[in-house]
Amino acid sequence: MSRMAEQQLYIHGGYTSATSGRTFETINPANGNVLATVQAAGREDVDRAVKSAQQGQKIWAAMTAMERSRILRRAVDILRERNDELAKLETLDTGKAYSETSTVDIVTGADVLEYYAGLIPALEGSQIPLRETLFVYTRREPLGVVAGIGAWNYPIQIALWKSAPALAAGNAMIFKPSEVTPLTALKLAEIYSEAGLPDGVFNVLPGVGAETGQYLTEHPGIAKVSFTGGVASGKKVMANSAASSLKEVTMELGGKSPLIVFDDADLDLAADIAMMANFFSSGQVCTNGTRVFVPAKCKAAFEQKILARVERIRAGDVFDPQTNFGPLVSFPHRDNVLRYIVKGKEEGARVLCGGDVLKGDGLDNGAWVAPTVFTDCSDEMTIVREEIFGPVMSILTYESEEEVIRRANDTDYGLAAGIVTADLNRAHRVIHQLEAGICWINTWGESPAEMPVGGYKHSGIGRENGVMTLQSYTQVKSIQVEMAKFQSIF
C-alpha cells in the first residue's frame, strides 16, 4: 500500500489541521513501512474540540431516545458494510492478521454499538412515593462532554466500546486514539457523521498521550475520562482527572491473569484454551492468561500438547487467509518483549519453544517475535510477575486446590482468570475465590456486549459493556414534589 495522505484531526463533523504544528508517523509493523504522517493535537485543539462537543451535545441530548437510537443503528449498518475495508486498515496499522481483524475487531465493535442503540429507550428514572401528598422522581441525565483514551491493541473496537455507551446516554465524546494505531478511529468519526450524528458529538484528536491525553484529563470542560492502558499511565490519568475537576473515571489497566488446569480436565481442551489465552492477537490482549497453572503430574503431557499446537501457528503475509499470527504492534514494543524473554532465561525458566525473533519468509523487516513458551517457572520470576503483552506463556505446576488459588491471587492485578475442569462444583467453588473481574470456565477470551468487563485491584476501576456501563455515563437527578400546602416553621 502506498503512503496515505497526512492525517488531520476530526472536529465538528470534519477534518481540520492541528494548531500545534507537530506530527508523528504511524508504521506498518509487518514490514516497517510508514503508513502515514499524523498531525498531533495541542492544547488549543483540545479547547476547540471541547467547545465543539459542548455545542453538539446540547443538540444530541435534546433528541428523543428513538432518534438517537436510529442514528446509532445507521452507524452500525455502515460499519458492517465497510467491515472488510476497515479490517484491512486495522491490519496495516496494528499488524494483526486480516483473518482476525475481519472477523473480530469491527464485528464485535459494531455489536456493542448495536447493543447500546437498543438500550437507549430503557434509560429511565423512577418514582418513589413518600406519603399521600409527597413523592420523589428521578431522572438519568447525561454527564455532558466525556473523553475516551484508547490503547493500541484494539483501536476501533476500543473506540466503539467507549463511544457507544457514552453517546447512547446523550453525551458527546472526544476520543484520543493511541499514537501507535490512530487510523481507524478517524474512519469511525467519518462513519458517525455519515450516519447523522450532530457535529461535535464525536471528535477525534490524535496525539501523544503525555501531551494530548494530559490536556484532556486536565480540561475542566470534560466530565469523565474512560482510559485503557498501563497502570502507571492510568494513575496519572486518574490523578489529573481528580485534581482538575473531580472527573469520573473508568480505568482498564491490564493484567497478569491465571489460567488453572485441574487434574480432571480434558488436556486437549486445556491446551486449546491456553493457546488462545496466550497467542491470539500475538499475545497483545490485556486479559491473556499468561500464568498457566497445571498439576505437576500433568505437566509433561500438557507441554507436549502445547508444542503440537504451536506447530499450527502460521506467521507470514498478514493478508493471507491462512495466517493466524502477526507481528507485534511496533518495534519498541517488540524490543521490550524480547527483554522480558532474556530476563526469563536469566532467571532460570526453561524455553520450551520460541524465545527469539522470527526471521525469513518476508519477516526480516517486521516486528516479529516467535511464540514463546517457558516452563519450570516460579512465582517470583519477572516473566510471571509483570505484564509482558506479547506471545509469552509461562507454565507453573501446583499440588493442591488451596495452593493454586493462593498463588493465582498473589498478584497486584485482577483483570481476568479462568479454570478448566470437568467438575462443575469445583468450577464455581474456585471461581468464587479468584480475585478477578472477568472469569471464564472451560473457555477463554470472549467478551460479548452484554457482559460487563473490568478488573479488580490494579487492573482497573469501573466496567465496560453491559447495562451498568450505560448508567455510568449518566447522573441521577432527584426531584421532590409536594402537592399539599407547604408548612414552614417560621
Swiss-Prot record:
Protein name, entry field: Betaine aldehyde dehydrogenase
Gene: betB
Positions of NAD(+) binding: 150-152, 176-179, 230-233, 254, 286, 387
PANTHER family cross-referenced by the UniProt entry: ALDEHYDE DEHYDROGENASE-RELATED (PTHR11699)
Pathway: Amine and polyamine biosynthesis; betaine biosynthesis via choline pathway; betaine from betaine aldehyde: step 1/1
Assigned keywords, A-Z: Metal-binding, NAD, NADP, Oxidation, Oxidoreductase, Potassium
Binding site for K(+) 2: 246, 457, 460
Family designation: Belongs to the aldehyde dehydrogenase family.
Chain's role: Involved in the biosynthesis of the osmoprotectant glycine betaine. Catalyzes the irreversible oxidation of betaine aldehyde to the corresponding acid.
